[in-house]
């Protein structure tokens, strides 16, 4: 029997760069019979990942039942000749500090502008597409979550 080919691991500097380049993740919640996965935009401050979550839906129920999650971020070429991903297992915490929430919301506004995202992305954050972008900062239509207590990181690359 031949040994399987293994995808090489990425050093921390490389997966931090992957996290900085991307802005969409998938969060797997485990507080149900079967895992539930949902896409989330995020911002990264160099130490923590932050997410904005609308205040309705299954994710809120699963978060309140069990905040332990897996977060996955990926990048790949269209033909899959090169791909990278990082998976982080940790705990989501709802940010309560008003000043910190404002900073994170401002980071989201800056990221949306920098990436030139469609106004339709506002619907994923609890806003109408024709709302001003600064409504993200001024209004509390979404919860601010922070990934903490990361115990396990798997970061792999090919190409």
PLM ranges: what are they?
Residues 1-20:
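Extreme N-terminal tail/first-helix region
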Residues 12, 56-57:
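Structural motif corresponding to alpha-helix initiation and N-cap regions
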Residues 22-55, 72:
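Short beta-strand segments
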Residues 30, 76-77, 131-132:
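Short, solvent-exposed loop/turn elements at beta->coil junctions and helix N-caps
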Residues 31, 73-75, 148-151:
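Short, structured patches in soluble enzyme cores that scaffold and shape functional sites
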Residues 54, 74, 157-159:
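Surface loops and adjacent helix of pleckstrin homology
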Residues 58-93:
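Helix-adjacent hinge/juxtasegments
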Residues 80-159:
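Charged, gly/pro-rich active-site loop segments
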